[in-house]
């Protein structure tokens, strides 16, 4: 997933109810648990129980390059899911991509 600096990142993890619902859902960036109370601010989590299971949405506002990473949603019961997020200026990415293709 590619996003521009200053935009909002919204990642949703849906945990389907097969047996027991998860007692907790933890989010990670790379290998570190996300701290919703960090000095960076602008990071929030919304968890919602639905008839089908649980939905957890991670919201990161005013994205910067420091927010680039592999985001993982890890429920206490069930399998984790991950997505790679890149915060880049579109022009910089096109130049890098052109360089990689030229090699």
Model-derived features: where do they sit?
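Extracellular beta-strand/loop-rich beta-sandwich domains predominantly from IgSF
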Residues: 1-2, 40-70, 76-77, 87
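Short, solvent-exposed loop/linker segments at the N-terminal edge
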Residues: 1-9
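Extracytoplasmic/periplasmic beta-strand context in beta-sandwich domains
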Residues: 25, 56, 81-83
């Amino acid at each position: 997933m590619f996003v521009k600096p200053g935009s909002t990142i919204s990642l949703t993890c849906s945990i389907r109810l097969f047996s027991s619902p998860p007692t907790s859902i933890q989010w990670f960036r790379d290998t570190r648990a996300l701290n919703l109370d960090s000095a960076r601010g602008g990071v929030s989590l919304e968890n919602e129980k639905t008839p089908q299971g649980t939905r957890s949405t991670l919201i990161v506002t005013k994205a910067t390059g420091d927010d680039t990473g592999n985001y993982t949603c890890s429920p206490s019961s069930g399998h984790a899911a991950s997505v790679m997020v890149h915060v880049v200026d579109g022009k910089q990415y096109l130049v890098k991509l052109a360089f990689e293709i030229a090699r």
